[in-house]
């Protein structure tokens, strides 16, 4: 139990130490307003990262999620602005489309035995291209429901305002934790990530599980696209460029092994929080370039990947170490 939770404990420790350092430099970090702003600003990333956690836990990768955000935004902007469709109808419509696209990619991955990297890369280019066909310019979204959702928030002690977007992200994390650790689907994801051949021998349908994994990933990416469109009040074909890498970084920093089979959704939440903490510190400082966020995340990735490799080698050595047998008769 301890060895499997060690990456999570290290991630939480890094976040706590980082937060304490920020607090010593800028006492304003003690305000709940800062925490709420981190949740709101990173709500779409957190939602995507939950879906990416399941993908990486299964030993796969999903590079299409950034393009899903872009397509979701321009699609909503078009159908709401040009066709007068209510967001209450447009949201479920685009969610169904996103889930169907993920299911299709999952089917191709399992049926054709092509690496997920290739299939989702194709999906990334396809959706980005379709987004450009819809519109090359940013399309503003003007609708009362969007205005209501973007301003909806609840006051909490300390001067903070927990937005509906931040609350939705936390709800997705809670549901993700439940799915991963309290359902048959979660057990199947861990089993496939640990050893797909053994999972097959156990009677687990890898095709059905793979389809559901990628359907969940693109479904949550579509939900993140909805959140992002509410956050920006617009749809843009260039939205979400590089977000897939931020999501992967959050998952890895959160302690999920890239080889699959080990990791937690809770760790991913802290991975997202660490990225948000670094960005907020840079904003507070005012003298540092925003690119320092990428540099810091890159350093953390190097550290956590090296840590993952070290832990993996340690576990393999322990499992392969010979068992000392004691001859009772000789005693």
From Swiss-Prot:
The lineage of its organism: Bacteria, Pseudomonadati, Pseudomonadota, Gammaproteobacteria, Enterobacterales. The chain crosses the membrane at residues 6-26, 43-63, 89-109, 114-134, 160-180, 223-243, 251-271, 295-315. It comes from Escherichia coli (strain K12). It is a multi-pass membrane protein. This is Inner membrane ABC transporter permease protein YjfF. Residues 27-42, 110-113, 181-222, 272-294 are periplasmic. Keywords: Cell inner membrane, Cell membrane, Membrane, Sugar transport, Transmembrane, Transmembrane helix, Transport. Residues 1-5, 64-88, 135-159, 244-250, 316-331 are cytoplasmic. It is found in: Cell inner membrane. GO terms for cellular component: ATP-binding cassette (ABC) transporter complex, substrate-binding subunit-containing; plasma membrane.
